[in-house]
Swiss-Prot record:
Its main location: membrane. GO terms for biological process: cytochrome complex assembly. Belongs to the CcmE/CycJ family. The chain crosses the membrane at residues 8-28. GO terms for molecular function: heme binding; metal ion binding. Keywords: Cell inner membrane, Cell membrane, Cytochrome c-type biogenesis, Heme, Iron, Membrane, Metal-binding, Signal-anchor, Transmembrane, Transmembrane helix. It comes from Ralstonia pickettii (strain 12J). This is Cytochrome c-type biogenesis protein CcmE. GO terms for cellular component: plasma membrane. It is found in: Cell inner membrane. InterPro entries: CcmE, CcmE-like_sf, NA-bd_OB-fold.
């Protein structure tokens, strides 16, 4: 083999390896990608059946039903135009309420019922976790105390 043929062989092998790595990476991203659909899109048959995706909307007022086991909850997610029945087995987030925003992750069954394996309650932009609110309150108090002390020392 000449030097040129060896170089060409190494270049081709590197290209094949790079192509395989790219294909594997793209395949991994595609399998982990979860799409978001509204109830109107689901009613229009735009959402895949038996494939994982996210459903977002509002919890319809008067739709929450708890089963006897205490862990299975049925409710309807609506976008005010259409509604999708959801069944979830597990603990709901503290912010889960009727009329509030929710994002559920799961699969749409053949019967049109969305079987959720995760439910996230959405909150408005004014929400602040209690720990963050306490930390902010303490920081404000420290700043006010420092301002008072510097004002006292400046007046002396």
């Amino acid at each position: 083999m000449t030097r040129r043929q060896r170089r060409l062989g190494i270049l081709l092998a590197a290209l094949v390896c790079a192509g395989a790595a790219t294909a594997l990476t793209l395949n991994a991203f595609r399998s982990n990608l979860v799409f978001f659909f509204s109830p109107t899109q689901i009613a229009a048959k735009e959402a895949p059946v038996a494939q994982v995706f996210r459903l977002g909307g509002l919890v319809e007022r008067g739709s929450i039903q708890r089963e006897r086991d205490g862990m299975t909850i049925r409710f309807i997610v609506t976008d005010t135009a259409r509604g999708v029945p959801v069944v979830y087995h597990g603990l709901l987030p503290d912010l889960f309420r009727e009329g509030k925003g929710v994002v559920a992750r799961g699969r749409l069954g053949e019967d049109g019922v969305f079987v959720a394996n995760e439910v996230l309650a959405k909150h408005d932009e004014n929400y602040m976790p209690p720990e963050a609110a306490d930390a902010l309150r303490r920081a404000v108090q420290v700043n006010e105390q420092m301002a008072k002390e510097s004002a006292r020392s400046a007046s002396r």
